[in-house]
UniProtKB/Swiss-Prot annotation:
Keywords from the UniProt entry: Cell inner membrane, Cell membrane, GTP-binding, Hydrolase, Membrane, Nucleotide-binding, Protein biosynthesis
The protein's name in its UniProt record: Elongation factor 4
Its membrane topology: Peripheral membrane protein
Lineage: Bacteria, Pseudomonadati, Pseudomonadota, Betaproteobacteria, Burkholderiales
Broad class of the protein's primary localization: membrane
Length: 597
């Protein structure tokens, strides 16, 4: 056990985490040069394209160190994005050490800090590494200073390297072996194994990635999953070097995979503990929690006959993504579709992109909403994740909305514009600190404001330099109202939004004006109204197309002309009673693009 090192790599997006992992795998001979490819641990196309890691992957490597000993290194690749923070914390709790990779030319950024604090809280040894030192604009001294200022760990002996050229990678591995403690655990104790991640394989069912903390896991063992209480028979165990290699057993301190003929991913929850039926562990490993979706949106197929196909696609995605939730939903405007719950905005984008890409779906997405808690007059509490389900205003005692703590990092030139943005978004400043040229701002902002377009606007006001991460803090009472859009006094449920009262007038006017541009002119007048309950707060009219009925009258009596006009008017009125307005596809997208002032 003294020769095992379990570690993961923490970094902000684009600081070179996956490239460094590639180099370490190559140096340890995990893959031959022919099999080596860029970002070898990122298996989905979308991961490679966006350069982000979504699922955790592992590689078990053996390395002959300079002291002549052979060490087993288990690299656990973690997602770096804030939406997947629970998966990150599970991956980190399976390690004893973490390489903190910081881009020497850019310094510390938000997600580095968020994940690094998670690591320190879990008692993981953090080993700082400066990457990209081959760049002409690299400034290692400044980066070291920032690591010490912002994160507060000693970085004087941070290892410089360049993952691209491979320079210094050996030093990184040596530093890792020297600083990271070997795993503690008892191979003879009852089995406790932590599920770090799980995914679905078409041939063998669910593959679970586990870290064995105590005990030994062998094929033919009957195991119990402690959170769900399900029992399974282990079929095979093994390790990834990134290729899968079967082993006879996994013992304490090792990281590997387990296949137990599980049919669906819901049964193998990330963070759950596996133990054997014959010798049960006293208690599960700490830290397990159910992942709850934070952001909801409606997904509808453009063609209504694609509904079944959309359901199948969502079910296939759920095989590989247990945090995705969905339930059928009917909208008068959009027909049949699904209400889906996501961990955050990035997660939502990825699901949409995978549906469009891997399953060829054409989708309409409604505006994302967060989960509100509604206290009713009769004392019951509802959770509302869909504006259409919001009860009548007369029944509502109070509405609570989720508040998140947002940490923002940016160069000091952009502080003013970022603070203005946060204030517009109803943010309350909690803290502000300077670290060299970088500034850290902490705000509490309602989550609803974040999901709208906060991230895009943050990037634009800071020219792409600001980075952020957020975490849920609490529910707070808030004066929010539901704004309905009526077209010819029919409610269009898919266009309803929940906004703060101070912003509702503006929002209603904007949406109505936007609709007026988008809805094509009909043979009769179309009235577009925005309403809160029964109060109309904004109205726009789309004028009717009309024929010039007076063209055939030359001169003649005014009463003749009046008669023709009245007749036309009566005809239009009749049409208006029976006509329905087709709402074009763009209208639903336009809702997402209404800019806040």
């Amino acid at each position: 056990m003294d020769h095992i090192r379990n570690f993961s790599i923490i970094a902000h997006i684009d600081h070179g985490k996956s490239t460094l992992a590639d180099r370490i795998i190559q140096r340890c001979g995990g893959l031959s040069d022919r099999e080596m490819e860029a970002q070898v641990l990122d298996s989905m196309d979308i991961e490679k394209e966006r350069g982000i890691t979504i699922k955790a992957q592992t590689a078990a490597l053996s390395y002959k160190a300079r002291d002549g000993q052979v060490y087993n290194l288990n690299l656990i690749d973690t997602p770096g994005h804030v939406d997947f923070s629970y998966e990150v914390s599970r991956s980190l709790s399976a390690c004893e050490g973490a390489l903190l990779v910081v881009d020497a030319s850019q310094g510390v950024e938000a997600q580095t800090v968020a994940n690094c604090y998670t690591a320190i809280e879990l008692g993981v040894e953090v080993v700082p590494v400066l990457n990209k030192i081959d760049l002409p604009q690299a400034d290692p001294a400044n980066a070291i200073q920032e690591i010490e200022d912002v994160i507060g760990i000693d970085a004087q002996d941070a290892t410089p390297c360049s993952a691209k050229t491979g320079q210094g990678v050996e030093d990184v591995i040596e530093a890792l072996i020297a600083k990271v403690p070997p795993p503690k655990g008892d191979a003879a104790a009852p089995l406790q194994a932590l599920i770090i991640d799980s995914w679905f394989d078409n041939y063998v069912g669910v593959v679970m990635l586990v870290r064995v903390v105590n005990g030994t896991l062998r094929p033919k063992d009957k195991v119990l999953l402690m959170a769900t209480g399900a029992q399974h028979l282990v079929e095979q165990v093994g390790v990834f070097s990134p290729k899968s290699i079967q082993r006879d057993e996994l013992t304490a301190g090792q990281v590997g995979f387990v296949i137990a003929g599980i049919k669906e991913l819901k049964a193998a929850k990330v963070g759950d503990t596996i133990t054997t039926m014959t010798r049960r562990a006293e208690a599960p490993l700490p830290g397990f929690k159910e992942v709850k979706p934070q952001v909801f949106a409606g997904l509808y197929p453009v063609e209504s006959n694609q509904y079944e196909a959309l359901r199948e696609s969502l079910e296939k995605l759920r095989l590989n993504d247990a945090s995705l939730q969905f339930e059928p939903e009917v909208s008068q405007a959009l027909g049949f579709g699904f209400r889906c719950g996501f961990l955050g905005l990035l997660h939502m984008e990825i699901v949409q992109e995978r549906l469009e890409r891997e399953f060829d779906m054409d989708l309409i997405t409604t505006a994302p909403t967060v989960v509100y808690q509604v206290q009713q007059r009769d004392g019951t509490v509802l959770t509302v994740e869909n504006p259409a389900k919001m009860p009548d205003p007369s029944k509502i005692e109070a509405i609570l909305e989720p508040i998140v703590t947002v940490n923002l990092y940016m160069p000091q030139d952009y502080v003013g514009s970022v603070m203005t943005l946060c204030t517009q978004k109803r943010g309350a400043q909690i803290n502000m600190s300077y670290h060299g040229k970088q500034v850290q701002l902490t705000y509490e902002i309602p989550m609803a404001e974040i999901v709208m377009d906060f991230f895009d606007r943050l990037k634009s006001v800071s020219r792409g330099y600001a980075s952020m991460d957020y975490e849920f803090k609490e529910y707070r009472q808030s004066d929010v109202v539901k704004v309905d859009i009526l077209i010819n006094s029919d409610k269009v449920d898919a266009l309803s939004v929940i906004v703060h009262r101070s912003n509702s007038q503006y929002r209603g006017r904007e949406v109505a004006a936007k609709m007026r541009e988008i809805i094509p002119r009909q043979m009769y007048d179309v009235a577009i109204q925005a309403a809160i309950g029964s109060n109309i707060i904004a109205r726009e009219n789309v004028k009717a197309l009309r024929k010039n009925v007076l063209a055939k009258c030359y001169g003649g009596d005014i009463s003749r002309k009046k008669k023709l006009l009245e007749k036309q008017k009566a005809g239009k009125k009749r049409m208006k009673q029976v006509g329905t307005v087709e709402i074009p596809q763009e209208a639903f997208l336009a809702i997402l693009q209404v800019d806040d002032k």
